Amino acid sequence: MSSLVSEIARRRTFAIISHPDAGKTTLTEKLLWFGGAIQVAGEVRARKADRHATSDWMELEKQRGISVTSSVMQFPYRRETADGKAQENIVNLLDTPGHEDFSEDTYRTLTAVDSAVMVIDSVNGVEAQTIKLLNVCRLRDTPILTFINKLDREGRSPIELLDEIEEVLQIQCAPMTWPIGMGKAFRGVYHLINDKVQLFDPHGEKGTAAILDGLDNPELDRILGSQAEELRIEIELVRGASHTFDKDAFLNGKQTPVYFGSAINNFGVQSLLDALCELSPPPLARNTDSRVVEPQEPKFTGFVFKIQANMDPRHRDRIAFVRVCSGRFERGMKLLHVSAGKTVAINNAITFMAQDRNTTEEAYAGDIIGVPNHGTIRLGDVFTEGEPLKFTGIPSFAPEFFRRARLNNPLKVKQLQKGLQQLAEEGATQMFRPLASNDLVLGAVGILQFDVVAHRLEHEYGVDAIFESHECATARWLKGTPAEIEKLIAKAGHNVALDGAGDHVYLAPSMVNLRLTQERFPELQFMETREIV
């Protein structure tokens, strides 16, 4: 039991959230590099050459230079603790799509982490997608570390950036490092906690030229000249005006420790990784419909937060990503697949390093394992050693955009149905079958998703499909007795469809129609979100 507790205590499971182009993929690469997980960081700007960013592995992502699915990467990281001891953590990094069209996949990924790193572009500050994602984290009081990136560019002043984060995101900022100059004048950072100056070297392998002790170090004046005295005055003001770090406030999602750096130059990344391991919580307790599951419980529990089709086109596979919530997983163990009511032996689970995969011999609470899925596992499904649990809080959103699928080759209907069904099981799109026709209607939270589906249908399933506009304003899941649902079908069946799980959905042609239908059928609930479990 003590080895179980110590293994779980080593785990840190987090996601990186940001607006597109804030440098999230670059930061992900550099964290992996500092963790020793990759030999060469696949620099994003060189993406059209042979080297693609390690976490952007799907063909479409490589073409577009954006992350459209969530990747999972695990690596060990050895660091020195504040008291000088060596400590090894197991880091589980979940890379999430930064593009606004993939918010639903990102949302679900954020249900599988214990903390998050928010990347802010020093030039652009807080942007729209950052606000949305932080609000998602806030629903679960997820602890947030902040990395203000691109200090090597001419950006906004650090005080202005912190003020904006506090005002717009309504979260206290506690600066842990402070920049010395910006843009061409950027010389490094001062560490407010341990009174050290870390000097910037854009040509050094790790971005650092030297680390000096103390602000009063005469060496600082020799290297920085007049900037040294400016730094001392600025730090005195910062200490007086800013919040000091409060670990309880951080763990409750009320305060964010802030680090400054330049991911593309490797600068500030190692400090962030050290802080992530030092400050972020180990795996946390999880709510179910019947009780709270503690990570140190000896029996295995886990839930599916993501399904990905065709991670390896050679294998035509589907993988269910399972967050381990408690206990220890061992290869070959028999687990209850709660929703199916069946016990299954898991012999070929895998761990991830983007698309690289290894068979998992064991995994602990906080880890992410991949379970091969032959169509029986769905988002939100739970695996246990026998207890019929359901983890709560894994949502599905009503789509905002709808398209009807049309085939250029009518003989490919079966392949189209199979492709749409499998891609919908990933949860980024939803498939609806109207009761009154043979149409296949696709719904998504972002318009770009239809391009992704068309591309993947063509390249992974050999189906050439066109997505035409479909007269639908919104979708609502129907909640009520079978008799009440039948009444609605009798009167307005042309607007009722079945979703991928076989549940009834009302596809409203307009918001006015939805309001009138709700008034006519007050006994039915028209649900905008549905908990997958």
UniProtKB/Swiss-Prot annotation:
Keywords: Cytoplasm, GTP-binding, Nucleotide-binding, Protein biosynthesis. Gene3D superfamilies: P-loop containing nucleotide triphosphate hydrolases, Peptide chain release factor 3, domain III. GO terms for biological process: regulation of translational termination. PROSITE patterns: G_TR_1, G_TR_2. Pfam families: EF-G_D2, GTP_EFTU, RF3_C. It comes from the Bacteria. Residues 9-284 form the tr-type G domain. GO terms for cellular component: cytosol. The keyword Protein biosynthesis applies. It is found in: Cytoplasm. NCBIfam families: prfC, PRK00741.1, small_GTP. Increases the formation of ribosomal termination complexes and stimulates activities of RF-1 and RF-2. It binds guanine nucleotides and has strong preference for UGA stop codons. It may interact directly with the ribosome. The stimulation of RF-1 and RF-2 is significantly reduced by GTP and GDP, but not by GMP. Belongs to the TRAFAC class translation factor GTPase superfamily. Classic translation factor GTPase family. PrfC subfamily. This is Peptide chain release factor 3. It comes from Cupriavidus necator (strain ATCC 17699 / DSM 428 / KCTC 22496 / NCIMB 10442 / H16 / Stanier 337). The gene is prfC.
